[in-house]
Curated annotation (Swiss-Prot):
Keywords for the protein's UniProt record, in alphabetical order: Autophagy, Endoplasmic reticulum, Glycoprotein, Membrane, Transmembrane, Transmembrane helix
Family stated for the protein in its record: Belongs to the TMEM39 family.
Name of protein: Transmembrane protein 39A
Main location as per UniProt: endoplasmic reticulum
Membrane topology: Multi-pass membrane protein
Assembly and binders: Interacts with SACM1L, SEC23A and SEC24A.
Function of the protein: Regulates autophagy by controlling the spatial distribution and levels of the intracellular phosphatidylinositol 4-phosphate (PtdIns(4)P) pools. Modulates (PtdIns(4)P) levels by regulating the ER-to-Golgi trafficking of the phosphatidylinositide phosphatase SACM1L.
Keyword hit for tRNA processing: no
GO cellular component terms listed in the entry, alphabetical order: endoplasmic reticulum membrane
Glycosylated position list: N31, N39, N251
TM annotation in the entry: 72-92, 110-130, 155-175, 182-202, 285-305, 317-337, 418-438, 444-464
Species this protein is from: Rattus norvegicus
Amino acid sequence: MPSRRRGPSRQQLSRSALPSIQTLVGGGCGNGTGLRNRNGSAIGLPVPPTTALITPGPVRHCQIPDLPVDGSLFFEFLFFIYLLIVLFIQYINIYKTVWWYPYNHPASCTSLNFHLIDYYLAAFITVMLARRLVWALISEATKAGAASMVHYTALILARLVLLTLCGWVLCWTLVNLFRSHSVLNLLFLGYPFGVYVPLYCFHQDSRAHLLLTDYVVQHQAVEDAASNVGSLTRSKDFLSLLLESLKEQFNNSTPIPTHSCPLSPDLIRNEVECLKADFNHRIKDVLFNSLFSAYYVAFLPLCFVKSTQYYDMRWSCEHLIMVWINAFVMLTTQLLPSKYCDLLHKSAAHLGKWQKLEHGFYSNAPQHIWSENTIWPQGVLVRHSRCLYRAMGPYNVAVPSDGSHARFYFLFHRPLRVLNLLILIEGSVIIYQLYSLLRSEKWNHTLSMALVLFCNYYVLFKLLRDRIVLGRAYSYPSTATDSRQTKLPLSSEGELR
């Protein structure tokens, strides 16, 4: 028989047609699970480094305009006026006259039972509410400086007179309250201070960590700052911690940090930690001051009402909740301005996010071992702490198992999330107050809703103005923050090649 020319064998076809293993899996064999044989053991092959396959695009940030923000003194003045208005409303809800009084009764000639009001308590509450305004006034006068010795002396004397007057009024009201009320009622006067001490005095280390670095770009600056951790976070006695916390509490002009668009993953994580500590401190200030204001404005007057005095408990408690929500929104708007939220958004864009995957999925996809010195692109699979994760952001330097990094990215990767939440809260309050105003039949309900609505309209106007301007600003195409990121790739150690 004539011999046929046989073609290449199946084994030769598979060897010549299929690409190399290194091309299929890239850097996965050396940095992850790689390929495995039938026995389950990994096949060790020389593969290129992980960063040869990682080319994340540059992080792009939008440029937002500088929106006007109320000054510290102006905001404290408006906030103090608002608290006085809601305090007056609460006294109307408690001490309004009722219809069953006889005509010849003294209270029937007036709208309020003025003879039942404790004026010492009202003066004490007013002084406590004015503490931030007084300190803001002193701080602004101190920042202005003194042009001459006479001006400096007058400034010192005015500060001394103002603080002495506030202290004297506070002591005078406390002495008279001690004479006319029981010890149980007087305990309500200092209850917020009992919450203040453990809340602020025992958590100063995280605040001191914020002062380690001002978001520097160079590695050497971070190393120098890290060497000073011991000196900044050394143990202090209780009195010094209390004085520092009180100083921070009264100091309302908290500076806004800056964003440096760092290239190193360590610097990005360090910036996120500093911003996270600063954000937690601001939220703590917002919660404490809003609860403090609502407590002294709406709750403390109820504690000193005589047992024979009738008032609408449901309406007074509803007023308490409204005061707390409005104070929370006002303080949040002041302490978390649009520039600060944009700073958090930029840092979250550099941080990235990891999604945890179930075992068994993506078993044939290339996987890598997570490295803290690598910037991971979107969609890459890594293994960390015996778990599989997938990169979700354009840049990903977050620790996959760190829940605080995931929460930070969730809150701030959308720049308008905080602003939309505040608008939703304030809008819901205004809609409910309008509904209550339409349904109200008593004069005190109508007056209280009308006065509070005027204050809420101003807050909602500022929020909607910022939302419209920022919404249009973020809709424009982003610009690359640093052209060096597109020209100089990163090595496996996080440095420029």
